[in-house]
A protein has these predicted regions:
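ATP-dependent adenylation/nucleotidyltransferase module used to activate substrates
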Residues: 1-105, 116, 124-126, 132
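AMP-forming adenylation/ATP pyrophosphatase catalytic core
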Residues: 73-80, 89-260
């Protein structure tokens, strides 16, 4: 409610109409439920990607168009640039500490063409200074957290609360398959270092620190914003988690939406 009131007051300061839409059920279905289901599959989800894809640039964008809006402007820290051939590209923000391009990866060409990120070229301190100069009540409001519906960071409890299902006990095994003990459920335990999760056998694979790292991975759910799927191996910098430092790598397309 505080966020809604802040938005109303800022809209009043700017002389803009302020609307409130209730997408509680959609948020639960498209973000929270998907988050819980992914954990139950042994995956590590990023609900911010789903929130942007299905809520902000899905339902909210559709409602904005219905209201006659030409573009959707948000406070995301990212940049949009049009290429010489007319296509749009998503770029990182000027402030690397606040860059949110990672969680906007599902934006399409059509969405990029009708989206504006006015904060993309600013540092957070500059954005706050502008907000303060214009008398915005939220100029010094605390930054939002990565997962808004798990404020305490207890993902296991959140999954149980969302699904109503208790995690089934299983075995801890090392990288050689040797049993090490039992766990309370695959969403609840991470002693030592988790090297893998075998969902069909309900096993958490543990290993030493040096066994944790890998020089390659397979990824699915790829979004090629340009519309062109690379036909040859591509040298890029990449990361697998939000705010993680990028690393150089070679990406090879292996399927319709998969890469190695």
């Amino acid at each position: 409610l505080d966020d809604v009131e802040d938005a109303r007051r800022v809209a009043y300061t700017l002389g803009m109409p302020h609307y409130v839409f209730n997408y509680k059920d959609a948020f639960h279905e498209q973000v929270m439920a998907r988050f819980a289901a992914a954990y139950q599959r042994g995956a590590t989800p990023n609900p911010c990607l789903d929130c942007n894809r299905y809520l902000k640039f899905g339902l909210l964008e559709s409602r904005a168009r219905a209201l006659g809006c030409d573009v959707l402007a948000t406070g995301h820290y990212a940049r949009i640039e049009q290429l010489p051939d007319g296509r749009w590209t998503l770029k990182k923000a000027a402030d690397p500490e606040k860059d949110q391009s990672y969680v906007l990866a599902w934006l399409t060409q059509e969405q990029l063409a009708h989206t504006r990120f006015p904060l993309g070229g600013l540092r957070k301190s500059e954005a706050r200074a502008i907000a303060e100069a214009h008398g915005f009540c939220n100029a010094h409001k605390h930054d939002s957290q990565d997962i808004c519906f798990v404020p305490d960071g207890d993902y296991a409890a959140a999954v149980e609360r969302l699904t109503g299902a208790h995690s089934e006990p299983g075995r801890f095994v090392d990288t050689q398959g040797r049993p090490l003990g039992t766990h309370r459920g695959i969403t609840a335990e991470t002693p030592l270092y988790v090297c893998g999760i075998d969902v069909p056998n309900n096993e958490v694979v543990l290993g030493r620190n040096e066994e944790l790292f890998s020089t390659e991975l397979d990824a699915s759910g790829c979004s090629w914003i340009s519309g062109d799927v690379p036909q040859q191996p591509l040298r890029v910098t990449a990361r697998i988690r939000y705010r993680q430092p990028e690393q150089p790598c070679t990406v090879t397309v292996t399927g319709a939406d998969t890469v190695h």
